[in-house]
Amino acid sequence: MIFALHGRPFKEDNIPYVQHLLYYLQKKEIQFLINESFVDYLVQCNILLPSFFTTFTNKTDLGKPDLMLSIGGDGTLLESATFIGDQNIPLVGINTGRLGFLATTPREELEGSVDELISGSYKLSERTLIKLISDEKLFGDLNFAMNEFALTKRDSSSMITVHTYIDGEFLNSYWADGLLVSTPTGSTGYSLSCGGPLVHPKTENFIITPISPHNLNVRPMIVPDSCHISFEIEGRNQNFLISLDSRAEIVSSNIKLSVKKEDFKIQLVELKNYNYYKTLRSKLNWGLDARN
C-alpha cells in the first residue's frame, strides 16, 4: 500500500507520536509519499525519516496513493484536501492540533488506527465542497473549499454591504463585516463562531451566515446546496477579501462572484470508534455543568 503524508508544524510534545507513526508504517511495509515541505520540517525536528520515500509538492506529483494521512489539526486536513481534489483518495486526519472536528484520530491510538486503515476497516463519509465562480481566474485550479467561502472587508474600517441572490432571486442586502457560505462540514467552523447552526454532514445544504451584521434581525439561513448564490459588494473601500478555507485573495468591488456545489466530493475516513454526535458532545463540552 502507498500512504501519502501531509502535515504542518506541530508542538514539540507531538514529536514522539509522529516518529512512532513513521516507524509503525515502515514496520507494516507501507510505501511513503511525503509532502516536500513537511519533509523539511520533520528534518528540523530531528525525526528519523523512512529509509526510502518519494515526495510531492502538488496534485500532479501526488499520483494515486491508497490513502492520505493529514498530520495536524482541522486546518491541515483542509489543506490536504486541496492536494486530493477530484481524485477520490480517502483522507484521514491524525490529530496533533487542538479541537479536531475533522482530524478525529487521536495520536494515542496510532497503531490501532493504522491497522484499521490497512485492513480497510473503515467507512467513507462523502463531504460536499463549495465552488467559487468568478470572472477572474481566482485561486487557479483550487477554487473550492471544504468548510466555507468567506467574503469580508479588507481592513478594520467601516462595514460592507453584500447584496445576495439565490438562483437570480434577491435574498437580502447584508450590512456587516462580511458574509459566509458554509458547507455542512464547515458548520462547526467559522460559521458556528458567527452564530450559525450545526448541520449534519450528510444533509444537502449550504449555510449563509452574516459576520457581525449591523441589523440584529438578520439571522443565518439554510438553503439547498443545489442553488446558485451570487453577490454584489459595496463599501467605502473598493477592495475586499475573499477566502476559501484558509486561502485568501484581494478583489475589487466590480468583480462578479458566485458559489455553487462542486462537482466532486472529498472522501473522509471514519474509523470504527468514530461517532459524529459523540464528537459534538466532547468537542463542544455539551452536558458539562459546574454543579456536576
From Swiss-Prot:
Function field: Involved in the regulation of the intracellular balance of NAD and NADP, and is a key enzyme in the biosynthesis of NADP. Catalyzes specifically the phosphorylation on 2'-hydroxyl of the adenosine moiety of NAD to yield NADP.
UniProt keyword annotations, A-Z: ATP-binding, Cytoplasm, Kinase, NAD, NADP, Nucleotide-binding, Transferase
Cofactor(s), names only, from the UniProt record: a divalent metal cation
UniProt name for this protein: NAD kinase
UniProt keyword Transferase, yes or no: yes
Binding site for NAD(+): D74, G75, N147, E148, D177, T188, G189, Y190, S191, L192, S193
GO MF annotation list: ATP binding; metal ion binding; NAD binding; NAD+ kinase activity
Encoding gene per record: nadK
NCBIfam families assigned: PRK01911.1
Catalytic residues of the enzyme: D74 (proton acceptor)
InterPro entries xref list: ATP-NAD_kinase_N, ATP-NAD_kinase_PpnK-typ_C, NAD/diacylglycerol_kinase_sf, NADK
Superkingdom of origin organism: Bacteria
Catalysis: reaction(s): NAD(+) + ATP = ADP + NADP(+) + H(+)
Gene Ontology terms: biological process: NAD metabolic process; NADP biosynthetic process
